[in-house]
Amino acid sequence: MLRARLLVPLVRPALVHRLDRCYSTALGSRFRKSNAVRSELKFDFPDVPVKEELFVQETPDKPLKENKTHVSDEDIDSLFDSLMSDHKAAEATEQHKELPPAEQERPSGANTHTAPIKHDTKSPMEYLAKSKLTPHVSRQVAKAMAGSPTQLLLATPASHHISTPAYQNDLWKHVISTLNTSKFQIPDFNSLMTTIPVDIRAQFLPQIEEWISQRGVKPSAITYGQVMLGYAEDGNVEKVEERFRQMIDNNITPTVHTYAHRLKACDKRGDLKQAMEIFDDLKLAQQLYGIRPNQVIFTTLISTSLRNHKVELASQIFEYMKYASLETQPTAHTYNSLITASAIRSNTERALDLFEEMKQKSVANVRTYQSLILACLRQEKYHLKAWELLLELREQHSESFYSRHTLVVVFQAAAVTGDLVFLRSLYKQLCMSPETYPDAILTQLLMQAYARYDTRTKPVASSALRATWGRLYGGNAQEMMRGFLFPDIEGMVQLNEEHPGMIPPFLPTNTIESLSFDRKKIIAESRAIFQFLKNNKPQLLDNIAATDYLKAGARHRDFPEFLRRYNEVSVGAGEAEGAVISPSEMKTYSARQKKPQRYDLQTQFSPAPRSDAHFFIALNAVQADCIADASERDPNLNHPLRRLTPQEMTDRLEFSQDVWVERGKWRKSDAYKNKYRTEAQQISADYNFALKIINALAALKQLGEAAAILSATPATFNWKKHDLAFFHNVAQAFYHEEAMKQIHKAVSRSKHLDEVIRNPDSEKSAEFDVFSI
């Protein structure tokens, strides 16, 4: 099970649940019936009658078989050189030039760089007159901004969800440094704080509070509220609680917003214990000040619970919201948080239940569809459902479809379902203009698609997108693509010729249907794309993209190419010192992040210090390279291994031994301890590495070595039959008695370990740490 999580992090096998054990978020939820929950969360809200509902489980589809063929290195190198030749000529004629910094940061469509606000023709005073600034503050701000080519970004409710760009932060620093507050009153200070974007406000609050103290003016409830909001956004729980105590000491009555700020600070820090204590205080505040919790209070508490992986608690609070009162009915944001949590736990059935509730209440929005699509992508049997929801999203919310978040979801759907042809076509379209150039997230997903793509005989029929859209367009892939993202798709074929400095060297194709990928094309194109981005757009290649690039070499069974990539994207612990950036400094962008990305345009691609992510892929590559394709297998043999030359066997065995030694050294480093902070995490990581080295040695027919490692593993390793199935099959095929004996012993020991867990008083076996070598 642990191995499956590492090899396929986004797609788990479909689990068949019994209806009597499934959880439904319909009105008959068991959470509403829990007296313990009602007493824990109880406020003076009326009860609501209950109804019961059930849901239907879909049946999983059978996966198609993969058609694998071995590829020669000469063919790959030849194709790679042909792909890169046009770009080398373009560089020689200086057709490829870097964009100016201002244009590099400009967003549109898929690009997530944050751009300067276009200069308005209105005067600064006209612009500031519409803000919440008092006239006295507006005049000083206008004076400070005189001559500036860009306008100052002012806080709005919508801007709370957008990251303030660095240059706007500098502008605000300039404005604050030039203010003369000698005549400021409390309304002036309040308007100033309200106007500063909330995500950068905390850094200016000490100066503003000092000005208030020097002026000797008395802070109001609004003053404390804006100060607490700024510190809460920064996750500074101590500062927020200190200001709350000052409010009480100054006899200023707190409001529901005051408690919302306190909970928000806990949410930003992920402090669930403190949040629950504040929630208990809120119950007392209801009696003292007549404060009743609103949607924001409950939604923030749900968010904090989810940050701490307390999905059960979040669900209980959610159910209580629905039945407490009309004022506390869950919002779209609340539903979306629960759908996202269900996606993380691969509980797609519950996510679909929540979606049906939202449709009944007409509160489903674009974010709902995005979260639900990601939930469907976590289970293979719902992949087609994900594409159907994507079509529905485009029809229901066409005005909001072309956004960064939706584009990331489209790329994720294509990457997870292995629709490389569709994904690379979209990526190429985005490269047509600097306004829409792909970001690091989309580059990650492109590399993931190369790693996940199955070389099948009929890729069009195997595509989840075409299987779904074929019903609408009669299987015409060209018609499906036309206008999906941009209306001017007809010129896609000539992009390499028209934009040689911007378009990566994709394989040419006349139509989408004409491109059929095999291993040679996948390896050559992914290598060419990576080299192009490495030389021209290194800021788009983070650690995740490099890892997926490495997986593509391992997945498509070209061991020499994999070794080249392994040394290109990673270095050993000894080589890393002074040569590459430290792991803490490495940039890794997440598709789940809500705020736009900021890139250092001066960055260069650097190989990462090796860790378990690299070691696991390396051993998987050895095992995959030893397994024969269906066309290569000898029908007279009862094992799946292909015949290797003595030199190939030696090379792969030496590489596996090098990985073993290097991982042992890394295990003693601080990087290992920082990555796995608990004993359970360390045991899990060591277990997975032991399993992979055993399978690699078994694939190399080194059954005695594999059996020796298995026998030396600690007693804390809970070996299961399905984990050792590959080793068992090979050992059985070669009649290796010692290996069979050790497998039986390890599995029996695990059964004894299960008994020890159930009965702590039973005898515990001694432990020997094989990884201390």
UniProtKB/Swiss-Prot annotation:
Asked whether the UniProt record includes Mitochondrion among its keywords, one would answer yes
Question: Which regions does the record annotate with the repeat PPR?
Answer: 220-254, 255-285, 294-328, 331-365, 366-400
Mind naming one GO cellular-component term on file for this protein? Answer: mitochondrion
* Localization annotation: Mitochondrion
Matches recorded under Pfam families: PPR, PPR_long
Q: Main location per UniProt?
A: mitochondrion
* One example GO MF annotation: mRNA binding
* Chain segment of the transit peptide: 1-23
Q: What family name appears in the similarity comment? A: Belongs to the CCM1 family.
What is noted besides the main data? Answer: Involved in mitochondrial-nuclear incompatibility, a major determinant in reproductive isolation between species, through hybrid incompatibility of Ccm1 and its interacting partner 15S rRNA between yeast species.
Function of the protein: Regulates mitochondrial small subunit maturation by controlling 15S rRNA 5'-end processing. Localizes to the 5' precursor of the 15S rRNA in a position that is subsequently occupied by mS47 in the mature yeast mtSSU. Uses structure and sequence-specific RNA recognition, binding to a single-stranded region of the precursor and specifically recognizing bases -6 to -1. The exchange of Ccm1 for mS47 is coupled to the irreversible removal of precursor rRNA that is accompanied by conformational changes of the mitoribosomal proteins uS5m and mS26.
The protein in question is named Mitochondrial 15S rRNA processing factor CCM1
Which organism was this protein described from?
Answer: Yarrowia lipolytica (strain CLIB 122 / E 150)
